[in-house]
A protein has these predicted regions:
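Short secondary-structure boundary micro-motifs
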Residues: 13-15, 28, 34-35, 123-124, ...
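Mobile "lid/hinge" segments at catalytic clefts and subdomain interfaces of large enzymes
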Residues: 1, 5-95
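C-terminal catalytic subdomain
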Residues: 167-209
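Short, functional N-terminal and low-complexity linear motifs
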Residues: 21-28, 57-64, 101-106, 141-145, ...
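Glycine/charged-rich beta-loop-alpha catalytic/anionic-binding loops adjacent to active sites
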Residues: 14-23, 153-160, 199-207
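Accessory "access/gating" subregions that flank catalytic or transport cores
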Residues: 64-185
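Charged, low-complexity, helix-prone segments enriched in Lys/Glu/Asp/Gln
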Residues: 45, 49-52, 120-123, 127, ...
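Active-site-adjacent bridging/hinge elements
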Residues: 28-34, 147-155, 194-200
């Protein structure tokens, strides 16, 4: 409930007996001629993405129970023969979430469930692997030097290059968008199945739609 207000920075500095920073040679250029904003934006997006990842498997588990799905698609043997890290982790988490579910232990009439349920490890896992890779890219970037030119004092060299170019970040932000879109897509398909009047569930999950 904190209240914020926009104030004149000059007045705030004076209140605290501080003087504005006077930029020296090259410091101004270093602040604007690099990937600082892209990096900050990407890290913010990744923080949000990782928060979302922490919830996706739990939400999916609830959907699996609500739709009375089989748990065979999450058996570790299926994922051991296609050992992608995210896929294995997702299947394991689903089984952990539903370990005490009475619904999951009941006899199932259907032989298989819809893709949106039985392919959760493959879809969620792919997005997890993608986001893990993107995390590594941005970790490297925020610990890198991206201004230009670059001064190498020990070598007594000033070199002009292209480290300011943000192509690496741009491509991986697109990759992040794809990974998140896939999580949203499969979630939407599960939602549709849940409200479509199947498995003895009322249409739209209400008694009088």
């Amino acid at each position: 409930n904190s209240k914020f207000e926009i104030r004149n920075s000059k007045l705030v500095l004076e209140e605290h007996n501080l003087k504005p920073i006077t930029l020296k040679s090259k410091e101004g250029l270093a602040l604007i001629n690099g990937t600082q904003f892209m990096s900050a934006y990407g890290v913010y997006c990744l923080i949000k993405a990782n928060q979302l990842l922490a919830k996706t498997d739990f939400i999916a588990s609830i959907s699996i129970d609500a739709f009375d799905c089989r748990l065979e698609p999450f058996h570790h043997l299926l994922h051991d023969i296609r050992p992608h890290k995210g896929q294995i982790a997702t299947a394991k988490k689903i089984l952990e979430n539903l370990a005490d579910s009475e619904i999951a232990k009941q006899h199932k009439v259907q032989v298989q469930d819809q893709y949106a349920f039985r392919c959760i490890p493959q879809v969620h896992g792919a997005s997890k692997d993608a986001i893990e890779h993107i995390n590594k890219i941005f970790t490297t970037e925020i610990n890198a030097v991206t201004d230009n030119p670059n001064v190498f004092a020990e070598e007594d060299l000033i070199l002009s290059g292209g480290n300011f170019h943000g192509q690496t970040l741009a491509i991986h932000l697109d990759f992040l968008a794809i990974a998140l879109a896939e999580l949203g897509s499969i979630s939407e398909r599960r939602t549709y199945q849940l409200i479509s009047g199947q498995r003895n569930l009322p249409a739209f999950l209400v008694s009088n739609p």
